Amino acid sequence: MKNCKQIATEWGLSERTVNDLCKKNKIDGAIKVGKMWKIPDDAKKPIDGRITSGKYVRHSAGVTRKPLPIGISDYVRAQADYYYVDKTMLIKEFLDQKPLVSLFTRPRRFGKTLNMDMLRVFFEISEENTSKYFEDKAIWQCGEEYRNQQGQYPVVFLTFKDVKFDSWKATLDKIRDLLQEEFGRHQELATSERIAEYEKTYFAKIINGDASEVDLTASLAKLSQMLTKHYGKAPIIIIDEYDTPIQEGYSKDFYDEIIGFMRNFFSGAFKDNKNLTYGFLTGILRIAQESIFSGLNNLTVNSVM
């Protein structure tokens, strides 16, 4: 026979919870000896909703305490190794409302990049079965129509969070590197029979780092066109912290150059682009629509206000 403290340790419960279960006759064979309960060595842990939820489990009873995902922007890692607040209902909201292009403005450290990576992992076509990262999340309980969207689209993902330089040349070089890396994620296009030779030549220029500024401004439009041809469906384009290089340009005296570049860059991606399923942008500020999103009438702005 064992006492409540010993059973509590074995079952991962508090001693008080085990004592209450004994009082309610929920543990077979438990008997009270004086002021203490004695429980058979082979007693079975009772099925109880409060217990399976983990609400009463103590850290001291063997539960591993997870760290907070501070500075973690990798969705797969965050939901597996850290305390993760389920934000997957954001996916349902998009699929219900179907805004073509969405802009999210939030202060720093509001989880913008993590949420965008969540969208990428959910929607992106992958050789890996990525549904396993959502099967225990809220979105998976919303029905087949939402589950059927998982892993069904090519995705273009860029984050400008580290584009912080003192000159336009250094900024453009970094953007060139980011595009080179993103094009590299889609190497299947280089050998695709559905892609024209002139498109493969352009693809190679980006991959080899030989693209001019004009080539770079057209890169999102070109890449989305090639992905549509290859996969037979238009991609989702995600741009994280789009305004970081713009803020740097404003403070470092190359604002005109970065605004001119971004206007053409985003116009090709989001304005009248038939090769686009959804577009998502995040940033701290909402740059005046006239300066950078000129003519983009399908932009839905989501702010904290």
Place the predicted regions along the sequence by residue.
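Phosphate-binding site recognition
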Residues: H59-M305
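Major-groove DNA-recognition helix of helix-turn-helix-type DNA-binding domains
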Residues: G12-K38
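Ca2+-coordinating acidic residues in Ca2+-binding motifs
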Residues: Q6, A43, E241
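Polyanion-binding surface elements
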Residues: M1-T17
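A short, Lys/Arg-enriched interface patch at domain edges and termini
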Residues: D42-A61
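Short polybasic/polar patches that bind polyanions
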Residues: T9, K23, K229
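A generic structural signal for ordered secondary structure
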Residues: C4, G29-A30, D48
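Short aromatic/basic micro-patch
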Residues: M1, K38, Y84-V85
